[in-house]
Amino acid sequence: MKQSEFRRWLEAQGVEVSNGTNHLKLRYQGKRSIMPRHPSQEIKEPLRKAIIKQLGL
Protein backbone atom coordinates (compact mmCIF):
# COMPACT_ATOMS: atom_id res chain seq x y z
CA MET A 1 0.00 0.00 0.00
CA LYS A 2 1.35 3.42 -0.92
CA GLN A 3 1.65 6.03 1.81
CA SER A 4 -0.84 8.30 0.04
CA GLU A 5 -3.42 5.47 0.05
CA PHE A 6 -2.76 4.77 3.73
CA ARG A 7 -3.17 8.48 4.54
CA ARG A 8 -6.55 8.55 2.76
CA TRP A 9 -7.62 5.43 4.68
CA LEU A 10 -6.58 7.02 7.99
CA GLU A 11 -8.51 10.22 7.18
CA ALA A 12 -11.58 8.12 6.34
CA GLN A 13 -11.31 6.57 9.84
CA GLY A 14 -11.39 10.05 11.39
CA VAL A 15 -7.65 10.56 11.99
CA GLU A 16 -6.53 14.20 11.98
CA VAL A 17 -3.43 14.59 9.78
CA SER A 18 -1.17 17.65 9.94
CA ASN A 19 2.17 18.42 8.31
CA GLY A 20 5.40 18.30 10.28
CA THR A 21 8.81 19.26 8.91
CA ASN A 22 9.66 15.93 7.27
CA HIS A 23 6.77 13.82 8.50
CA LEU A 24 3.02 13.75 9.05
CA LYS A 25 1.56 14.11 12.54
CA LEU A 26 -1.40 11.83 13.20
CA ARG A 27 -3.96 12.37 15.98
CA TYR A 28 -6.95 10.22 16.87
CA GLN A 29 -8.99 10.44 20.09
CA GLY A 30 -6.08 11.85 22.12
CA LYS A 31 -3.51 9.39 20.74
CA ARG A 32 -0.64 10.48 18.51
CA SER A 33 1.73 8.93 16.00
CA ILE A 34 3.94 10.09 13.14
CA MET A 35 4.44 8.85 9.59
CA PRO A 36 7.21 9.74 7.11
CA ARG A 37 6.08 11.98 4.24
CA HIS A 38 6.88 10.08 1.02
CA PRO A 39 3.46 9.75 -0.66
CA SER A 40 4.59 7.80 -3.73
CA GLN A 41 6.56 5.16 -1.79
CA GLU A 42 5.22 1.94 -0.36
CA ILE A 43 4.72 1.91 3.41
CA LYS A 44 6.26 -1.15 5.04
CA GLU A 45 3.84 -3.52 6.74
CA PRO A 46 5.44 -3.36 10.23
CA LEU A 47 5.25 0.47 10.19
CA ARG A 48 1.63 0.41 9.01
CA LYS A 49 0.67 -2.01 11.79
CA ALA A 50 2.57 0.04 14.40
CA ILE A 51 0.74 3.24 13.41
CA ILE A 52 -2.63 1.49 13.58
CA LYS A 53 -1.75 0.06 17.01
CA GLN A 54 -0.48 3.40 18.36
CA LEU A 55 -3.70 5.13 17.30
CA GLY A 56 -5.88 2.32 18.66
CA LEU A 57 -7.67 1.61 15.37
Curated annotation (Swiss-Prot):
SUPFAM superfamilies: YcfA/nrd intein domain. InterPro entries: HicA_mRNA_interferase, HicA_sf. One of its GO terms (molecular function) is endonuclease activity. It is an enzyme of class 3 (hydrolase). The keyword Nuclease applies. Keywords: Endonuclease, Hydrolase, Nuclease, RNA-binding, Stress response, Toxin-antitoxin system. The keyword RNA-binding applies. Its EC number is 3.1.-.-. Pfam families: HicA_toxin. Belongs to the HicA mRNA interferase family. Toxic component of a type II toxin-antitoxin (TA) system. A probable translation-independent mRNA interferase. Probably forms a complex with the cognate antitoxin HicB 1 which inhibits the mRNA interferase activity. This is Probable mRNA interferase HicA 1. It comes from Photorhabdus laumondii subsp. laumondii (strain DSM 15139 / CIP 105565 / TT01) (Photorhabdus luminescens subsp. laumondii).
